Curated annotation (Swiss-Prot):
Family the entry assigns: Belongs to the inorganic carbon transporter (TC 9.A.2) DabA family.
Protein's job: Part of an energy-coupled inorganic carbon pump.
Subunit organization: Forms a complex with DabB.
Descriptive protein name: Probable inorganic carbon transporter subunit DabA
Source organism: Dinoroseobacter shibae (strain DSM 16493 / NCIMB 14021 / DFL 12)
Superkingdom to which the source organism belongs: Bacteria
Organism ancestry: Bacteria, Pseudomonadati, Pseudomonadota, Alphaproteobacteria, Rhodobacterales
Gene encoding the protein: dabA
Cofactor list: Zn(2+)
Keyword field contains Transport: yes
Keyword entries, A-Z: Cell inner membrane, Cell membrane, Membrane, Metal-binding, Transport, Zinc
Length: 791
């Protein structure tokens, strides 16, 4: 096979390839799943621009169906004034009624530009696109395997090289009606960049067509592209690089080129498609209308949210109990419930890793868990107390037994011989009566932190929590986790700020740190006087069962004795708060008929909806708790405690806006994407999932890796339970401080400037005073005023 010279330079080619790689978000493995913004690669673009691009590269919507907007308008939840405001913000001189009437008409579904495989499927070989997907998936599943496969693939020599070795011996394409495909592949260069040049030349692509075409190829790979992007994400955190996704794009381009080379009858159709890839991409009128409707829905929600805030109130008396929870929206319900138990209870909200970026090694493990936000790298290491050697032996025996049960030959004998002995376990698991997990050993820093570093960490964390005075006798540091059964996506219900693990380790490390006498002395020298009778105790909030477990055994004997009465009272309050929270949540859980049956329900191995996770999230409030305490926010708002008057230099505010807010945006937009485009950004149905490679799930036995939230996480069987709204950030801080932070952080500013996050400013008197409009500018927040006149 010969190739004519290409006019496209290697630099141009690799730049377009790198752009396509950056357009794809990472997908984290099932063992530590965290929410990822599916529009991460489009953060620098507006919603209508993104709709235009993803319409051509993925054939997906980027907003809810028009029918959803029409229903919201009919119910009065989207108002005409809000539509008028959204039109003005978009710079569109359209009548409001044009947008309102458009909501009642469903727009044509976006159609992705066709690849050569698509053209072959439409004209000559109907099953060819699925065949291409299946053959690439069959290879890539083994290539990406993280230890699940019993017959592992050989040592990798490079993504493209490994695939080429597989593909040139795979006879499936020939049998599927593409004779000569393998022969064409065998003539390809062994270097991936040279192979990509050869493919581009065969396809006749121009420089203008490359960015959109490569993006289209990456999107056609589904979750496999995101799994590959994860490898690059991890490498970049370590200051390195990874070419897996870039080489997957080579593989997909080669597949197209080979199809065209062996089916020349497709040339005329491909000429038309190739021209479309090279054409400028601009939003259509439908894209603009959808963006206006989306903005109007969010403005209407903000108008309602503005009624929820109260003036700042200063606490006079010493609290009876303080409890710091994760900012997770699920904490809002139990925090509110706990506060009703006694007027002396005060709760706080803080990112659930509690300021400790810990790489933690559980008992018996050789691998560490990154219990920290995925935006950060580990700063400390820790391990669980206990006999690690004995635990490792137990772990290895358990793993070996599991391998025996699953092996190709022994699995049949195992089922025949040992199956009846598992009957009792099957019954217990079906009824949700399995044994509770044992509490892991107390975590300790390993190696120990130097004393000065301990004091630095304690002071930084308490300052960031706005907790520097008026300490209660007992302060609970409550991480959160979710104990569920038979759930491949269990880690997605854990703490996102802890990298998809529970927050118990971080909470226990911090509580122990704050109880150390030398740390207390060091804090006092820095102006943070913790009373001698104040004791910190860690806890775990189980979000599936709304139960709070105090880790009192972590305390020293002296502290346990001193806090006996406080601990007993705290347990009573926590139990009552759990009962109230379960009572509030029960009506929203399908099939949950008894308030106290939620715990057993969460442990049922047949339950596809053990809890709703963060479904419904709509806002993130950065303010003193007293401003939100009177409101019932229905578990839909992230609550981060913050007092700007204590934040000299606004370093804490900068940390909040650049870390927890960004993580929350990933969470919100993952739910958003899983609702508006479940076929592309959703995780499919749990009822047909098969775990593959330990990193993701397939619908059935092959095909694209499903990334995002399963339909059961956002849909109750009758309707969606998550409103597709972009997150509104409400901040009580001076405008100048917020603007200055945005000016210094381009990535965060892009989220606000392009509308992926909304920003409002809250005053001390409980009123929303300003709305951020982009480009470091603000406007007065007066929902409906000017718009009503325009309407």
């Amino acid at each position: 096979m010969t190739h004519t010279a290409t006019l496209i330079s290697v630099d141009t080619l690799t730049a377009a390839q790198a752009g396509a790689v950056q357009a794809i978000p990472p997908a984290f493995p099932l063992s530590a799943t965290v929410a990822v913004n599916p529009f991460l690669g489009q953060a620098g673009h507006s919603l209508p621009d993104t709709a235009a691009v993803l319409g051509k590269t993925a054939g997906c919507a980027t907003t809810a169906p028009r029918s959803w907007f029409a229903a919201e308008i009919a119910a009065g939840r989207i108002t005409k004034p809000a539509v008028a405001e959204a039109l003005a913000a978009a710079g569109l001189d359209w009548p409001v009624d044009k947008v309102i009437s458009a909501a009642s008409r469903q727009r044509p579904a976006p159609q992705a530009l066709p690849t050569v495989a698509d053209l072959a499927g439409a004209s000559e070989a109907p099953g060819w696109p699925a065949q291409a997907e299946a053959r690439i998936a069959a290879w890539v599943a083994g290539h990406f395997d993280q230890g699940q496969a019993l017959w592992a693939a050989g040592a990798p020599s490079g993504t493209y090289a490994d695939w080429l070795a597989f593909a040139t011996t795979d006879m499936t394409p020939d049998l599927a009606g593409l004779p000569g495909f393998r022969a064409w592949l065998k003539a390809l260069p062994s270097d991936p960049t040279e192979a990509l040049l050869a493919a581009v030349n065969t396809l006749g692509l121009t420089e203008a067509a490359l960015p959109l075409y490569f993006h289209r190829l990456a999107m056609s790979l589904g979750g496999w592209a995101q799994a590959a992007r994860y490898r690059l994400w991890q490498a970049e955190l370590a200051g390195q690089t990874d070419t897996t996704l870039a080489e997957l794009i080579v593989i997909r381009a080669v597949w197209d080129a080979g199809t065209l080379a062996t089916r020349p009858a497709l040339a005329a159709q491909w000429d038309t498609a190739r021209a479309a890839f090279a054409a400028p991409v601009t939003p259509s009128e439908d894209d603009l209308i959808d963006a206006v409707l989306q903005d109007a829905a969010e403005r209407s929600t903000q108008a309602d949210l503005a009624q929820a805030f109260a003036p700042v109130a200063k606490a006079e008396a010493r609290p009876a109990l303080q409890a710091a929870f994760c900012i997770d929206v699920r904490s809002e319900v139990i925090r509110r419930a706990l506060e009703t138990c006694d007027p002396g209870i005060e709760t706080l909200g803080f990112a659930g890793f509690f300021g400790l970026t810990a790489a933690h090694t559980p008992t018996g493990s050789c691998n560490s868990e990154a219990r920290l936000p995925v935006l950060l790298t580990a700063g400390v290491t820790s391990k669980a107390s206990g006999d690690h050697d004995a635990a490792r032996i137990t772990t290895r025996v358990t793993r070996a037994w599991g391998r025996f049960r699953q092996a190709a030959v022994s699995s049949f004998a195992f089922v025949e011989a040992a199956g009846p002995f598992y009957a009792g376990k099957l019954v217990r698991d079906t009824l949700g009566l399995g044994k509770a997990d044992a509490i892991p050993g107390k975590p300790v820093f390993d190696p120990p932190l130097p004393e000065e570093a301990q004091i630095d960490a304690a002071a930084t964390i308490l300052n960031a929590m706005s907790l520097k005075s008026n300490f209660a006798p007992l302060v609970v540091i409550a991480g959160h986790g979710s104990h569920v059964n038979n759930n491949a996506h269990a880690s997605a219900l854990q703490c996102g700020a802890c990298g998809g693990y529970g927050g118990d380790v971080n909470a226990r490390l911090l509580a122990d740190l704050l109880n150390q006498p030398h740390v207390r002395a060091g804090l006092a020298a820095r102006g943070i006087a913790v009373p001698e009778d104040t004791i910190f105790v860690a806890a775990l909030h189980d979000t599936a069962q709304d139960a709070i477990t105090l880790y009192a055994d972590d305390l020293s004997e002296a502290h346990r004795a001193a806090a006996t009465a406080s601990l007993a009272q705290a347990r009573q309050w926590c139990a009552e708060a759990g009962r109230l929270a379960r009572s509030e949540r029960q009506p929203s859980l399908p099939g949950a008929t008894e308030r106290d049956g939620i715990a057993a329900r969460a442990q049922s191995w047949a339950e596809t909806r053990p809890e709703w996770g963060l479904a419904g999230c709509k806002a993130f409030v950065v303010a003193p708790r007293t401003q939100t305490a009177p409101a019932q926010l229905d578990g839909r708002v992230f609550l981060h405690s913050y007092d700007w008057a204590q934040d000299e230099g606004f370093g804490v505010l900068e940390l909040i806006l650049t870390a927890p807010v960004v993580v929350a945006s990933w969470i919100s937009l993952q739910y958003y994407g899983s609702v508006v485009a479940p076929e592309v950004f959703g995780g499919g149905s749990k009822q047909v999932h098969n775990v593959t490679g330990g990193m993701g799930v397939l619908d059935g036995g092959t095909g694209a890796l499903r990334i995002g939230l399963p339909i059961q996480s956002v849909h109750d069987g009758g309707s969606f339970v998550h409103d597709p709204l972009r997150l509104t950030i409400v901040v009580n801080a001076p405008q100048e401080a917020i603007t200055d932070i945005l000016a210094r952080h381009d990535g965060v500013r892009a989220l606000f400037d392009n509308g992926w996050l909304k920003l409002l400013r809250l005053e001390a008197d409980g009123t929303i005073s300003e709305r951020y409009t982009g480009d470091l500018t603000w406007e007065a927040f007066a929902p409906g005023t000017e718009a009503a006149q325009a309407a």
